[in-house]
Amino acid sequence: MIKLESLQDPSPRKRRTKLLGRGPSSGHGKTSCRGHKGDGSRSGYKRRFGYEGGGVPLYRRVPTRGFSHKRFDKCVEEITTQRLNVLFNEGEEITLDALKEKRAIDKHAIRVKVIVKGELEKTFIWKDANVVLSQGVRNLIGVA
């Protein structure tokens, strides 16, 4: 025989769903648990994540820790002489735009530095002020 104290609440999967708008005796009739007027009573309304009813949200109450220069950093890329030998032909002009076009550097780069790795097998035209040559590359091409 089943006793009253031995009854258990059904598991969440078997629990009956809340029926809304089915008359006053259901306890969820008329406004369907949405209250009167305001955004929350309207269809399609969703409160954004972290909203605390107009109070100062947690992410603003907690103090910031540290500081990052990431958003202020200037994007300076490096490219090797070995890579330039592969990407460019003899006598070609090496510019920032040409390097971006060949996807040798990041599209957000504002300057590129050429560093030595292997020999410089071809001669190139260096006119772009944003393409900086390292001391080793200057020695290779004979520019002091």
Swiss-Prot record:
Stated role: Binds to the 23S rRNA.
Superkingdom of the organism of origin: Bacteria
Name of the encoding gene: rplO
BP GO annotations: translation
Self-association state and partner proteins as the record states: Part of the 50S ribosomal subunit.
Region (Disordered): 1-48
Record key words, sorted: Ribonucleoprotein, Ribosomal protein, RNA-binding, rRNA-binding
HAMAP family the record matches: Ribosomal_uL15
Native source organism of the sequence: Chlamydia caviae (strain ATCC VR-813 / DSM 19441 / 03DC25 / GPIC) (Chlamydophila caviae)
PANTHER family attached to this UniProt entry: 50S RIBOSOMAL PROTEIN L15 (PTHR12934), LARGE RIBOSOMAL SUBUNIT PROTEIN UL15M (PTHR12934:SF11)
UniProt-recorded Gene Ontology molecular function terms: rRNA binding; structural constituent of ribosome
One Gene Ontology cellular component: cytosolic large ribosomal subunit
Similarity remark: Belongs to the universal ribosomal protein uL15 family.
Protein name as it appears in the record: Large ribosomal subunit protein uL15
InterPro entries, alphabetized: Ribosomal_uL15, Ribosomal_uL15/eL18_sf, Ribosomal_uL15_bac-type
